């Protein structure tokens, strides 16, 4: 039994929150028992700034993209089963067959996530990156546009079903991954200069999909000032 590691910050985040319950559902047993082994699952977790101290590390679909690698990465403590995509594999000098897919796609294996026929799906749903929430007001923008706002801080089990029932999802990365797995059309968007295209490309290249994001204007003056300041 192993301890599943994910970023559990002050604000909930859809992609990170999937780790909380998805692995035990897919694997059929709990990973939430700390025996000194840490599993790096969904997310950009192969990072010196994130990885906790452990006796052993198992990489199960995680990716790179933020920080330097852990100091002992690749040593005897590390077992790499799979990574998010070909860019992570190339960066880590791994064989191409280690580049599988982002683990969020595994929601497709759950019986309650069987794709719905188009006749049973309705409306457009929008999910911003959770870091866009404090300075933005995307819920109000969605209300004005007649679009369903998906709060990335809501428990992921709830949001997943709302994605499943949408006709189109406009979203940050993990909502798009889930939408793709559930056969719901999706459009990638950029809301901030901090948007990480490496992560998007890592995933889309694992499926031979194009990545053509749409950049949206800020939803508030505060968000506009924030985005401007991040460019310098």
List the predicted regions and their residue ranges.
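Active-site anion-handling motifs in enzyme catalytic cores
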Residues: 1-232
């Amino acid at each position: 039994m192993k301890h599943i590691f994910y970023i559990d910050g002050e604000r909930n985040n859809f992609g990170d929150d999937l780790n909380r319950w998805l692995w035990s559902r897919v694997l059929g047993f709990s990973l939430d028992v700390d025996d000194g082994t840490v599993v790096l699952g969904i997310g950009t977790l192969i990072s010196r700034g994130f990885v906790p101290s452990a006796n052993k590390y198992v990489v199960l679909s995680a990716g790179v993209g933020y920080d330097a690698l852990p100091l002992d990465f690749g040593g005897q403590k590390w077992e790499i089963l799979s990574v998010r995509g070909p860019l992570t594999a190339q960066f880590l000098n791994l064989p191409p067959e280690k580049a599988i897919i982002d683990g969020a796609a595994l929601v497709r294996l759950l019986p309650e996530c069987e794709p719905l026929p188009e006749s049973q799906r309705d409306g457009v749903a929008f999910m911003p990156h959770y870091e866009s929430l404090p300075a933005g007001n995307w819920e109000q923008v969605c209300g004005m546009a007649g679009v369903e706002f998906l709060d990335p801080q809501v428990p992921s089990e709830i949001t997943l079903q709302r994605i499943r029932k949408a006709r189109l999802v406009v979203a940050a990365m993990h909502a798009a991954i889930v939408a793709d797995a559930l056969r719901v059309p999706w459009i990638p968007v950029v809301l901030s200069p901090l948007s990480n295209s490496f992560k998007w490309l890592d995933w889309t290249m694992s499926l031979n999909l194009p990545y053509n994001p749409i950049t949206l204007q800020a939803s508030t003056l505060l968000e506009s000032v924030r985005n401007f300041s991040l460019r310098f």
